[in-house]
Every structure is written in structure tokens, then in C-alpha cells.
Amino acid sequence: VTERSGLVGTGGGKGPSGANASLIRGRYVLCKAHNDHELAVVQDGAVLQVDGRIEAVGAYDELARRHPGLDTIGCLRHVVIPGLVNTHHHVGLTPVQLGITDMPLELWLSARLYARQVDGYLDTLYSAFELIGSGVTAVQHLDTMRPAPVSAWPERGHAVIKAYLDIGMRVSYALCIRDQNRLVYAPDEQFIATLPPALARETADWLSKTHFRLEDYETDFLEPMIGAYSGGRENLTRIWLAPINLERCSDELLLLTKQWAARHKIGIHLHFCETHYQKLYAERRFGKTAIRHLHDIGFLGPEVTLGHAVWTTEDDIDLIAASDVRICHNASSNLRLRSGIAPVRRFVERGIPVALGIDEAGLNDDRDMLQELRLVKHLHCAPGLYDEPLTAAQIFRMATENGARSIGFGDEIGSIEPGKRADLVLLDYDRITAPYLDPAISPIDAIIYRARNTDVDTVMIDGKIVFQDGRTTRIDRSETLDRIARSLDVPLQPEEVARRRFVHAIFPHIRDFYVDWTLPKPEPFYAVHAMR
């Protein structure tokens, strides 16, 4: 057997009854978080996978003795971890790549209309390369690209899902929907009435093209998509629901979503209180906090994940904890768009499951999930000798088990234990620890503090190697990037020109809309500076 980058074998021999089986070996196998401070770790360990399912975890010598003749993937230079889960993701080419720099969310959402139109399949492959290359094996794809009419939505969904399946990733796919307040946090007609006549007519015409009947969503999109992917293609796909947020969804739509989730036994991902303007919207519209309103209409429940949840009060957190809701923390996005910092430590203290998402892109304008773990570790530290920051074990759980549960794969992935699917990542531990690392530093601390996407050696999903030696095994990355470049190396299409002109015209009016939306001086959960 030829040794390649420290790997022995190429992905599986024949196990019992001719099954595809292999041993995945590492100096350490990090199985799961026992608690907030400890991980289950096997030293010089291995994972036995048979037909994509983990059959055993234990000492390598013992498993090799019991199962002679199997290919061994990995060696003592590696550490084996569960595949990471990105619980909040939208696009491939980043907004910056498409001409939109960071700005507050309420302006940035409108500026996104400036972007070039990118083929959905190729665009998804682009981000999938980056995700897999940083150890992500499953993703919650929240698709905001809704072509008109509704009948075109399944084709869009199929293209995105096909990209993930072709590259070998797990995906929970949701098409984001909305039915009100589509440009600002006020009724469309009310905002249009403030615009100059010509721009008002253009805005009304543009909004009319995005209208759909709520009942059509279930019959024309949701049910066909669930039928197309239920149990198919190695069971790598889930179809999820994503009402975009409280501000842009009527109570009718939110409650319909709740009914659809119950009827089809699927989950919901809702963008929630991302900015202080969204916090103010709920107070102005309902006379109470956003979470209190969702509670009062019966929306909250264990099938719901709230994305962001930056501007939550102490009472809000009590309601979230009592409702068995999950939260997805998007640290990079909240910093880049000046949204704030979610009180993640308070969530954890209250026992609320927190997952992690990179959103559109991380701080480096890429999808390095390992860097995102490090950011979360350092972001939630307050000054002082007696502050207790998040532990490495807590962050590890967020990026694995909690993420898996949030996107509908909780019974299948998120930990390394018998019965789970073999979604595994081999990191080059020699590179992470070079030239020296004191033995007092645990493997998970070494990963959180030092690992980068360049340390990802091999990624296995469902027992199949999808990334090795710095490249994906199923799709040629260079060829795909060339195709993307060629597709955009053309003059702007008339529709793109019209959208850009519309953005330039409407943008000042959107900015002016929020001029008197002033947030009272907040009392933060933990302070990082003081004026005096």
C-alpha cells in the first residue's frame, strides 16, 4: 500500500459479506463532548466504518486485530473528529466578490440586489469546496434566490441540492420566504407612498414580481421537494422551512410554516433579532419583544432554530429556554454587518442548545469553519480575572452535535459512536502542533486555538472520501472555477443593469427610513469597554 500524505489506503476494503469497510486511524479520536469540560477521546484510536455506518470505536491495535485486511485511512500524525456542521449558509460567491462591501443589514440587504446573477449549481459548488476544505460535512443552506414565478422554485432548489450531492455533502435545504415589508420594516404600500412618483411605480412593479400565494408554497414547492429527496441519494438531504424573519413574515405565514412543519415532520430556521432595528420593530409593531410575540402566537417549539438572536433580553432567554428552541450563532456575520454580539454565554448557562453558522462568509471572506470556532472562543470573553469564557468542549459540541440536531441529522451525525454515519475529518496534528506543543494542551484546545483549513487532510462523508490531498475527489475545483469565471466574463444582462439602477435609486430612501429608529442605551450582558 502506498503512503500518501500520511494516509494508508484509499477509502475502503471489503468487510464482512463484501461490505465496503475501512479503519480510520488517528493519534487521537475525538468522539463527543461528555460535558462542558471533557471530551470522549481515544488515544491511538480508530473508527470502524462499514457501508458508511460506524460499527466500532476503540484502540487501533485491537480493531486491526479483529478486522484484518481492511484498508487503514490515517495514522499517528492525525486527529480524527466528527464532521463539522455549518448551520447557517446562503451563497457561493461572497457579496464582496460580487461588488457589495459590508454595511448594516438593513442597507446591505437592498445592496445585495446589485449582485451579478450566478448559476445556482456552480455558485453552490464554489462554497461547497470551501466548506469541505475546512472540515464541514453538513450544511443548512438557506436559499434567498427566489426566481419568479413559484413554479420555477423547484428547479432552483434541485440545482443547489445537486451541487451538494455531486460533491458528496449532506445538506438541509430551505427556500427562504416572506410576504410583507420587503424593502423596509413597514408595509410595502406605506413605503412606496414616500417615494417620488416614477420610483414609486418602478418599486411597485418590482415588488409585484415577487408576490406569491401562501398556499402555493406547500403544494407547488414544499411537497414536491420533500417527495423528490425523501430517503434518496444515500439519505444525504433534508428539506427544511425558512420563513425569513419576523419583520418580513406575517403572523399568517409564520403559523402556516408551523403547520407545514408539523404535517411534514420537518424543522424551521428563522432569522431572528439580528439587529437592533429588528428589536425596535417588534416593540413598535406589537408593544412587546419579538420572542414574546412568537411565544404568544404559538410559534416557538423544539423544531425551531433561531438564527442570530443578538438582541434578546433576559426574559427572552427565559422564554427560549422554556420552549426548547435552538439558536444558531453567526459570529463573523454579526461583526461584519455591525449587528452586535449575541449573548451566547447566557444562552449556554440557561441550557439552550447553540449551533454555529458562517452565514454568507467569515471574517476572511471565506468559509473556514475552524477559524469560526476560534472566533467564537475569543469573542465571548469579558475583562477580569474571574470571568468564565466558553470552553473548547462547549464550542466543539456547538459545531458538531448541536448543529446536526438543528438541521435534521441529529440521529445520524454529530459524534463518533456506533450507529452514527461515518462523517469524519482527519486533521494533520503534526502540522497543528509544530514545532512544539506542551503536552498539557489537550487535542481539542490545540484544534480550537491553532487549526486552520490548511490542516484538513481528509474528509469522509457517509464512509466515502470526498476530500484528500487538498482537493475534492468527485468534482474538479479548477474546472468549476474556470466555468464560473467564464460565465461572469460577459457584459451585464439587461435585467442586471435594471437592478443596479434600481438599487442606486432606492438606496437613499431606505437609509432615510430608519433615521429616527434610535435604540435606547442598552445594558449589555457583558461589557468590553467603558467611557469613564
Q: What residue ranges belong to the model's regions?
A:
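His/Asp/Glu-enriched, well-ordered alpha-helical/loop segment
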Residues: 296-303, 345-433
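C-terminal regulatory/interaction regions
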Residues: 478-482, 486, 499-532
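Alpha-helical scaffold segments that flank or form the walls of functional sites
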Residues: 98-170, 217-234, 485-487
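N-terminal metal-binding scaffold of metallo-dependent hydrolase/deaminase domains
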Residues: 1-66, 78
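Active-site gating loops and adjacent loop-to-helix segments of metal-dependent hydrolytic enzymes
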Residues: 95-123, 149, 181-212, 276-301, ...
